[in-house]
Amino acid sequence: MITLKQALSLSQDELETLKNEIDAKVRASDLNAYIKAPSLNGASAKGVPILIKDNISVKGWEITCSSKILEGYVAPYHASVMENLHQNGMAGFGLSNMDEFAMGSTTESSCYGITKNPRDKNRVPGGSSGGSAAAVAGGLAVAALGSDTGGSIRQPASYCGCVGLKPTYGRVSRYGLIAYCSSFDQIGPITQNVEDASILFDAISGHDNKDSTSANLKPTQTFKNLNRDKRFKIAILRDHIKDASNEVQLAYENTLKALKEMGHEIVEKKMLDSHYQISIYYIISMAEASSNLARFDGVRYGRRAQNIKDLKELYLKSRSEGFGDEVKRRIMLGNFVLSSGYYDAYYLKAQQMRLMIKEQYNKIFEEVDLIFTPVAPTSAHLFNYHASPLEMYLSDIYTIGANLSGLPALSLPVAKDPLGLPIGMQFIAKAFDEQSLLDVSYALEQELDLKLD
């Protein structure tokens, strides 16, 4: 597939040809990365076609978050990132499959069915932005937008062999993103290479008056300033690596060796056990989800239950029929931790611990430029692999720290396991220092020159 950098130099006629080629490929594909053929919606404007995750509002398109409860909901406005794309020569073209309401790590909970990993169709693409990553890796999209709440851009990028960037919280507007967890969610790019990630990130970044959490900063110019010759002081967290598979640990050590040979300084640091981060993340995210999803009741928009006797039954039936099992589970747990008698014991303590984790990151970043970790404990696993929801939650162990602390992080493919499946590693940077993430990843990408196809 043509890269985003190359596509931006195409004429309007050439772009129309490209869109027709993508549409034909999507119709012929069995990956189920797109919800439907992109030509059925058409492009959101003239420009390079960008795949959009199904929780980002595109005016005139049915946006469902891959959930039955939003069937028939047509977005009445563009998300701010869509307006930014249009101003930078890009446009939405197609909606990607995802875990329902972004709650999952496998893209198995979508009401549209599973998405397959293009590297091995018996395996998951990761989630929740699994459709976006599968499409980019499978040659079905030039580039894509995803959202990252606890690793939902970086983990599927790692499983599929793409570059995935989670920006600093507040760097990219969330206006028009259908919320899962408002204090964690961030929109970001999934692309074929680091240059494309930089270009797409620059296009969507910047202050937005319609988002009260948006940082008052101008759009970034990371692509213009990409520098592969910069050298960084990089921290590693040895105690956290023990949970990774042997293949991931080997890829980690080999990448560390490459970073040292490139001239980067590597230092060891310590942090709170990452298993605590899992508990903190899920308590807070489920609490916020139970509040955010209370708006879907069958009254104002989306699916409405039939043959009901009163308002209470309308609420009960609409939500019971509309939400999938994983979403129901998280709503119930969220309501539990917010209930009287448990609020102080769970939610309040989790918020206090979140602040402590953020302070630990800040302390490390007083002495280093970047932190280097795996993205996931394993490469992509088979469908129905997890015996329990808790096992699935543990797959986020390396990614949630950046969300808890609001820091930027980037997933870069660095190796293949014995089955030929991609393995990604992650850099985390100081708040609003996406430039360093992209610089070090750009240099490492060229140094490793990994061939996945």
Swiss-Prot record:
UniProt entry keywords in alphabetical sequence: ATP-binding, Ligase, Nucleotide-binding, Protein biosynthesis
Catalysis: reaction(s): L-glutamyl-tRNA(Gln) + L-glutamine + ATP + H2O = L-glutaminyl-tRNA(Gln) + L-glutamate + ADP + phosphate + H(+)
Pfam families: Amidase
GO cellular component, one term: glutamyl-tRNA(Gln) amidotransferase complex
Any one GO biological process: translation
Residues at the catalytic site: 53, 128, 152
Single GO MF annotation: ATP binding
Key word Ligase present: yes
Record-listed E.C. numbers: 6.3.5.7
Function of the protein: Allows the formation of correctly charged Gln-tRNA(Gln) through the transamidation of misacylated Glu-tRNA(Gln) in organisms which lack glutaminyl-tRNA synthetase. The reaction takes place in the presence of glutamine and ATP through an activated gamma-phospho-Glu-tRNA(Gln).
Family named by the database record: Belongs to the amidase family. GatA subfamily.
PANTHER family per the UniProt record, alphabetical: GLUTAMYL-TRNA(GLN) AMIDOTRANSFERASE SUBUNIT A, TRANSAMIDASE
Subunit structure: Heterotrimer of A, B and C subunits.
Name used for this protein in its record: Glutamyl-tRNA(Gln) amidotransferase subunit A
Species, as recorded: Helicobacter pylori (strain P12)
